[in-house]
Amino acid sequence: MRSQRLAGHLSAAARTIHALSLPIILFWVALTIVVNVVAPQLQSVARTHSVALGPHDAPSLIAMKRIGKDFQQFDSDTTAMVLLEGQEKLGDEAHRFYDVLVTKLSQDTTHVQHIENFWGDPLTAAGSQSADGKAAYVQLNLTGDQGGSQANESVAAVQRIVDSVPPPPGIKAYVTGPGPLGADRVVYGDRSLHTITGISIAVIAIMLFIAYRSLSAALIMLLTVGLELLAVRGIISTFAVNDLMGLSTFTVNVLVALTIAASTDYIIFLVGRYQEARATGQNREAAYYTMFGGTAHVVLASGLTVAGAMYCLGFTRLPYFNTLASPCAIGLVTVMLASLTLAPAIIAVASRFGLFDPKRATTKRRWRRIGTVVVRWPGPVLAATLLIALIGLLALPKYQTNYNERYYIPSAAPSNIGYLASDRHFPQARMEPEVLMVEADHDLRNPTDMLILDRIAKTVFHTPGIARVQSITRPLGAPIDHSSIPFQLGMQSTMTIENLQNLKDRVADLSTLTDQLQRMIDITQRTQELTRQLTDATHDMNAHTRQMRDNANELRDRIADFDDFWRPLRSFTYWERHCFDIPICWSMRSLLNSMDNVDKLTEDLANLTDDTERMDTTQRQLLAQLDPTIATMQTVKDLAQTLTSAFSGLVTQMEDMTRNATVMGRTFDAANNDDSFYLPPEAFQNPDFQRGLKLFLSPDGTCARFVITHRGDPASAEGISHIDPIMQAADEAVKGTPLQAASIYLAGTSSTYKDIHEGTLYDVMIAVVASLCLIFIIMLGITRSVVASAVIVGTVALSLGSAFGLSVLIWQHILHMPLHWLVLPMAIIVMLAVGSDYNLLLIARFQEEIGAGLKTGMIRAMAGTGRVVTIAGLVFAFTMGSMVASDLRVVGQIGTTIMIGLLFDTLVVRSYMTPALATLLGRWFWWPRRVDRLARQPQVLGPRRTTALSAERAALLQ
């Protein structure tokens, strides 16, 4: 009953399409014209409505935007580098050119949010200049998230600014980095789309002409495919230009390739069944109904499978994948509808003129032989196909992916040229650093937190695979000069060293003092001897003076007696007026007057005697003081000698100690040893250090960032493996410190690809499970057999693994080009979507032919579908393979991997593996359906295999 109802619906649809073939064709032509007029070309829309490909909920993107917010610098994840390269060392001209560039870039606030001007600051200039001095760079944070149209516009604006400033002779400027790399990917992806489309059309035209040997048939089929492609492009452009969906380079390339391949496949299904019916003797109209009844449900199921599988990508989180969901699903539904309406209408019109009539008798002998071999020896055939599949499966364990986009865009791309220039002077990872931020709840601008920040930098730096860490405590990647405790201790002895010679001079003065004291002692002892002699002389003189005094007193007494007797005579000399004139008188007067001085003389002698007595006493006392004076001086001399000896040894020890401390400090400083970092409080007042604080600490001082450079390629599996150890090292560094509650963020190339890697695993799992479930449900609805549906799904899964393994073998081991990380998920998703088509067509035909018996039905099914499916599979495969002409190597890898999968599915799985499995399972292949009931059902989905029936009866049986 179900088959009869389906046949009735298909017959009604076939009659309607046949009757309204011209209006249907005109409707599709009008629709194509309208959607292509109201919306720009797909490539233009993709450029202006390109979505950011980074996962918005990824920790790395959250971290990048948090860093920009806390430092009040940017709110996007797009970074670019402007690289200066000179033939000689960069000098003043290069700096002036650089300053002009930075000034112009800073004026473009629309596209440039922040400039990390390291080279413009002498404090950090060495950190952004190459070791040979011939290259330097400035990092820019641009508007828009990476991969989005706004970010690409920002990159273009930066490139225009750089191009507008003429460089000095011998100096070149390059715009490179992750942002420009993503922009170049869009440019070259769009540029290659016309090439891919042209090659696809050429391949399809050649294969169609070879298959059908009819130029008119091939041209009509190509026109149908072209009309469907234009319709899909216009519809998707209309949706995108009205912001109903986002696009990306990969979306456009995959969409165009799938549209061309699917529309070609479906029209091959239709034309193949039409020609088969004509070959059995049916007239053109009957062949049309046979074609529609035998393929419409297959096209419908295939279209729903492919579109549904692509729409399952909407459950994924990565924009790389979820941007494929709506465009590809809508595009493939459009192809399916066109293949069920436009293509039959064109065939109906063209068949009236015999344009699709077979030009030669088609032979099924080859496919009958293959079918016979399969049903006769299903076990060996299955074993042989498994061995072929094993070739690819064995290559899977050696699979190595690569995340570096540089290797998958043309080397002539501007960003790639910049990367190559950077590689000539810098380590490979310099253009793609990681940024670690520690966010605390207090101001970090103090010596205590500086110790912890340096501990974080040191711990991260000592993580395997890390080449350099720049932070406030090591702005050039090494600890700040003279910041080790041994050096600072050595510097504390600098004053001692400076005073050491003075100390030596004073010790020499002490020695001189000792000598002078000895000399003074000698002089004093000599003085003592002289004083003793003087004392003796004074004592004798005192005795003589007393004797002289006594004699003078006696003389005075005698003269007094004389004066008493001669007083009258004396008076006479005074009375005589003319005494002066009388010599004897005057002489007597003078003599008598002189005797008056004897009294005075005796008084003076008495006084002199008193003085000599005092002098004699004092002299003896002075002599008595010289002995203790000499003893004291001797003691002072002995003390001076002791001090000289002691200080001489002390100075020697101090010299040795300061020399060792200085050597130790210089050694630690020269070795850049970071085991004993310390910044004294006065360092925070240093103007240079304050500039460093502005670079590495947020304006409020609560956040500190670290610029981390990998030792190898950050966009690799090895680079990704560094992320967890970096986070663990930072977490361990703050454990037990005042910053143990701080939040730690990490952003950059490796952390982004780590998030993409983890997101890819999740997304692929979701997409694969959802697609397999969807395929199984659709296959179950068509075949109504759990086992048959499971076989189709199982062979698709096996085909995926083997095809991808063969791609690994070809690209990685033969061409020595590791597969891009995007190849695996993209290829799996697309091959899941299209891999069941040919098995579905075979099983559907087997279901029609099962009335002749299981084995005979299989032979007939293979004979009836072999040629058509092979042509369709080859066309689909080579259409996807034409993506290898893309300038983006990743697109070529995706296309060739899908091509290998389709070739394997067409030539091995559909031709041998699935028939062998169906034969081995026998009746169980159709479980839970019963084969006897299936055989008794009227075969309404295909023509009767007899020429005895009239064409009209055969048409009614379809």
Curated annotation (Swiss-Prot):
TM annotation in the entry: 19-39, 192-212, 216-236, 252-272, 295-315, 329-349, 377-397, 762-782, 791-811, 814-834, 868-888, 906-927
InterPro entries in UniProt: MMPL_dom, MmpL_fam, Mycobact_MmpL
UniProt-annotated location(s): Cell membrane
Gene3D superfamilies per record: Multidrug efflux transporter AcrB transmembrane domain
Keywords for this protein: Cell membrane, Membrane, Transmembrane, Transmembrane helix, Transport
Family: Belongs to the resistance-nodulation-cell division (RND) (TC 2.A.6) family. MmpL subfamily.
Protein name: Probable transport protein MmpL1
Species of provenance: Mycobacterium tuberculosis (strain ATCC 25618 / H37Rv)
